[in-house]
């Protein structure tokens, strides 16, 4: 149908059955698992006497709990060691491929699968992780799921789901120098709110989206969930195909040509019907940073913390809570705010282009006195590629630590944590209270280049004022 969106087409192709409840049983083409949300699912499977239905459609890695300073086994943290050992055993017993530490293919699950060509247009992808929407960058429909649903996918390769509405977010114009996909998505969430996408899939489209690289599209789709959307996607195009070609799991030869012509047919048609549409202009977006305790509490780096009068009535209680927790005054400029810790990495911004952008700001400069700054590549492949380019040396010479791959300080499940009231400049995706490991720690979300600028100056700084080396 020319009125069908990509979401409609992919949904229809994966529909196993309509259930009496009105929900759909949806086939899952690719199931990604990791050490945190899979152990209970495997245990439940065993209790039920069930086996993994499609081990060949299941791929595992380890990311959340791994230390980034030394990955020697056994880990100092006994629980982390137990979680990894359990994953290794579950994969071995069930014939599931594990991209483990030192394999050359380990990484944060949402960095690892795309770079190996596992994620492809037209797929349904599920993973027991909130930020599975990342894979929508390829024109896939990708959902984060809970542990009981991980069990269901292992057992049946399908999920019970209700079909979403589709909102197209059309972005005209071009992003200005120093403004990245991270700024764009923070701007979108600021504009539509953290609950604005509830019940929706977001289709990102328009000239500004088409101009994004695949890695930038992954950043954008990664944070669709932070705007309340269940998933976000970009229609596959030549950028998608060029990225996938030659990757280990991508089709090759004649199968490649067939795949590309099939992938092209999936894009939303010119007459596609959307349930809602929002239009934005990329040229008006400044480097954007969160000031509060949700990803929706964002402002341009050249703006001030909003006053209550500038805040919609329903958002005022949260704004007051954020002023108190963050120790900020309404009307206070965000530029110049001192930071303690600078973290570059995560499934949002731990890819090679992110590290290049940050390194271009760090090159020839020095991390400010008293600032702890560190870089955590998103995968072993990203680390190897960055080291081959000498990016690790650029960071080290500037005074950053260069770490081993993992989720690191995005979340408090490994040794990388804030202490006390420390404030971090972070390229990750969530700034909730306590998210980075200290119950009173504070997080400012921003692009990797902005984090690098904060590390060099010791405070929130407009990256556009620091010309790249």
Q: Model regions: which residues?
A:
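Fe-S-dependent hydro-lyases/dehydratases of central metabolism
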Residues: 1-469
């Amino acid at each position: 149908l020319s009125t069908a969106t990509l979401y409609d087409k992919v949904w229809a192709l994966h529909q196993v059955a309509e259930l009496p409840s009105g929900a759909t049983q949806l086939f899952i083409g690719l199931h990604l698992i990791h050490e945190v949300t899979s152990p209970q699912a495997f245990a439940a499977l065993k209790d039920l006497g069930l086996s993994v239905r499609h081990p060949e459609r299941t791929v595992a890695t380890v990311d959340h709990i791994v230390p980034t300073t030394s990955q020697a086994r056994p880990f100092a943290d006994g629980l982390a060691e137990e979680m990894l050992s359990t994953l290794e055993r579950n994969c071995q017993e069930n014939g599931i491929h594990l991209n483990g530490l030192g394999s050359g293919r380990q990484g944060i699950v949402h960095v690892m699968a795309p770079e190996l060509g596992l994620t492809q247009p037209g797929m349904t992808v599920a993973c027991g992780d909130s930020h599975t929407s990342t894979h929508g960058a390829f024109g896939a429909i990708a959902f984060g799921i809970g542990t009981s649903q991980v069990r269901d996918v292992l057992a049946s390769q399908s999920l019970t789901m209700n079909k979403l509405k589709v909102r197209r977010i059309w972005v005209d114009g071009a992003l200005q120098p120093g403004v990245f996909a991270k700024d764009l998505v923070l701007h979108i969430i600021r504009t539509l709110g953290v609950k604005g996408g509830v019940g929706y899939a977001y289709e990102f489209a328009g000239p500004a989206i088409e101009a994004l690289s695949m890695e930038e599209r992954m950043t954008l789709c990664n944070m669709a969930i932070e705007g309340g959307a269940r998933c976000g996607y970009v229609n596959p195009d030549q950028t998608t195909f060029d990225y996938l070609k030659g990757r280990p799991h991508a089709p090759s030869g004649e199968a490649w040509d067939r795949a590309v012509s099939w992938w092209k047919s999936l894009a939303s048609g010119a007459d596609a019907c959307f349930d809602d549409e929002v239009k934005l202009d990329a040229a008006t977006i400044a480097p954007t940073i969160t000031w509060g305790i949700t990803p929706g509490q964002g402002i341009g780096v050249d703006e001030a913390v909003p006053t209550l009068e500038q805040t919609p009535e329903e958002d005022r209680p949260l704004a007051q809570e954020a002023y108190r927790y963050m120790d900020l005054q309404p009307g206070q400029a965000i530029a110049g705010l001192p930071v303690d810790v600078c973290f570059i990495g995560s499934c949002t911004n731990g890819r090679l282009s992110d590290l290049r952008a940050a390194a271009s700001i760090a090159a020839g400069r020095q991390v400010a006195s008293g600032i702890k700054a560190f870089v955590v590549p998103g995968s072993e492949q990203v680390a190897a590629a960055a080291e081959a380019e000498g990016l690790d040396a650029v960071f080290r010479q500037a005074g950053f630590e260069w770490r081993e791959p993992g989720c690191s300080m995005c979340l408090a499940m490994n040794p990388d944590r804030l202490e006390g009231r420390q404030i971090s400049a972070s390229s990750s995706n969530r700034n909730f209270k306590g998210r980075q490991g200290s119950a009173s720690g504070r997080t400012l979300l921003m692009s990797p280049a902005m984090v690098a600028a904060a590390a060099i100056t010791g405070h929130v700084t407009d990256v556009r004022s620091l010309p790249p080396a």
